[in-house]
Swiss-Prot record:
Pfam families: Ribosomal_S5, Ribosomal_S5_C. The keyword Transcription does not apply. The keyword Disulfide bond does not apply. InterPro entries: Ribosomal_Su5_D2-typ_SF, Ribosomal_uS5, Ribosomal_uS5_bac-type, Ribosomal_uS5_C, Ribosomal_uS5_N, Ribosomal_uS5_N_CS, Ribsml_uS5_D2-typ_fold_subgr. It comes from the Bacteria. This is Small ribosomal subunit protein uS5. Residues 17-80 form the S5 DRBM domain. GO terms for cellular component: small ribosomal subunit.
């Protein structure tokens, strides 16, 4: 007998955001009467122009779990400075035992990154980057480490303002 599939509100929302589902995991809560199954979902959402967010959702049904994760990702969007479709400089990020190294790449290189990192870069709008993950390959930790590395990105104008110089003085 087929179970009732709940209608998900705002399904297929057309707000110009790119959505990627990274992982759907079946989780179990053991109670006195047996096991309660649920689904935990990890997603990323971005506008393709430097804004990206990560979300987690958990529910008894997969579509509801995905919807919760997408909404959570939309609520947590952060702005990342980009330059010509890549990151402005090298960066390292960590979360738990996961470590991520990011490096800018010339145009035409493409996204050279594994698994969960690739999804983050695609929704962010990065077209050329070289990324390496070290340590844990847990998708959640890799995404958080990628966000940590991206949050360390600064533009030349931000560096100039901190040093009390002009941009021309920094590059000369």
């Amino acid at each position: 007998m087929a179970k009732f599939q709940p209608k998900v509100a705002d399904e297929g929302r057309d707000d110009g955001m790119r959505e990627k589902m990274i992982q759907v995991n079946r989780v179990t809560k053991v109670v006195k009467g047996g096991r309660i199954m649920a689904f935990a979902t990890l997603t990323v959402v971005g506008d393709g122009d430097g804004r990206v967010g990560m979300g987690k959702g958990k529910a008894r049904e997969v579509p509801v779990s995905v919807q919760k994760a997408m909404e959570s990702a939309r609520r947590g969007l952060v702005k990342i400075p980009l330059r010509n479709g890549t990151v402005p400089h090298n960066a390292t990020g960590e979360h738990g035992a996961a470590k991520v190294l990011l490096a800018p790449a010339p145009a035409g290189t493409g996204i050279i990154a594994g698994g969960p990192m690739r999804a983050v870069f695609e929704v962010l709008g990065i077209t050329d980057i070289v990324a390496k993950s070290l340590g844990s390959s847990n998708p959640y930790n890799m995404v958080r480490a990628t966000f940590d590395a991206l949050s360390r990105m600064t533009t030349a104008s931000q560096v100039a303002a901190k040093r009390g110089l002009t941009i021309e003085q920094i590059f000369n």
